[in-house]
Amino acid sequence: MSNQTNKAQDNQVEEIVEGELLNENATEATDEASLMDELTQANFRVEELEKALQEAEAKVDAQKDSVIRAAAEVDNIRRRSAMDVEKAHKFALEKFINELLPVLDNMERALQGTDAEAEATKAIYEGVELTAKSFMSTVEKFGLVQVDPQGDTFNPELHQAIGMQPSADFPANTVMMVMQKGYTLNERLLRPAMVMVSQG
């Protein structure tokens, strides 16, 4: 009996050991499957995070581009505004000076129509001449320049031809006579000079 009991006990021990081994193998298999599952989930999460990172980087790049464009636009607006202010300062007097041009023309006509040598009109001539010179020097300080092209080559940007006449004294396309002087304000034409041009 002791042999049988020993065998029975050995069988029981073997069954217990086999059961434990099976349990260990099953646990190891379960642990391995669990680890594989966790690894798969971790890989999936890494892929999700990488995708989210790429999207975030794309958004950052788009924002950087927007910031660069906005900065360039601000610089352009600043430059345009500065140019507009400069032009406004430069040409603010344009309308006012245009109103003064007939006064200058009338003084020129008064000088042309008055005899500078006659005793009766000499004082008037000198007074008008001094007034015209003073007036012209004052407006020149603000950028007004007189265009008096007598003897110059005809320039359609500064002169307006009233007519053409044949002339032996002047080469072709030369201003023979100035009917009315022109004016520029800060290098911008206010009024062209009215001229007679030679045909040659």
From Swiss-Prot:
Transmembrane segments: none annotated. PROSITE patterns: GRPE. The keyword Ion transport does not apply. It comes from the Bacteria. GO terms for molecular function: adenyl-nucleotide exchange factor activity; protein homodimerization activity; protein-folding chaperone binding; unfolded protein binding. One of its GO terms (biological process) is protein folding. Residues 1-25 are annotated as: Disordered. GO terms for cellular component: cytosol. Keywords: Chaperone, Cytoplasm, Stress response. Residues 1-11 have a biased composition (Polar residues). InterPro entries: GrpE (IPR000740), GrpE_coiled_coil (IPR013805), GrpE_head (IPR009012). The keyword DNA damage does not apply. It is found in: Cytoplasm. CDD domains: GrpE. Participates actively in the response to hyperosmotic and heat shock by preventing the aggregation of stress-denatured proteins, in association with DnaK and GrpE. It is the nucleotide exchange factor for DnaK and may function as a thermosensor. Unfolded proteins bind initially to DnaJ; upon interaction with the DnaJ-bound protein, DnaK hydrolyzes its bound ATP, resulting in the formation of a stable complex. GrpE releases ADP from DnaK; ATP binding to DnaK triggers the release of the substrate protein, thus completing the reaction cycle. Belongs to the GrpE family. Homodimer. This is Protein GrpE. It comes from Shewanella pealeana (strain ATCC 700345 / ANG-SQ1). The lineage of its organism: Bacteria, Pseudomonadati, Pseudomonadota, Gammaproteobacteria, Alteromonadales. The gene is grpE.
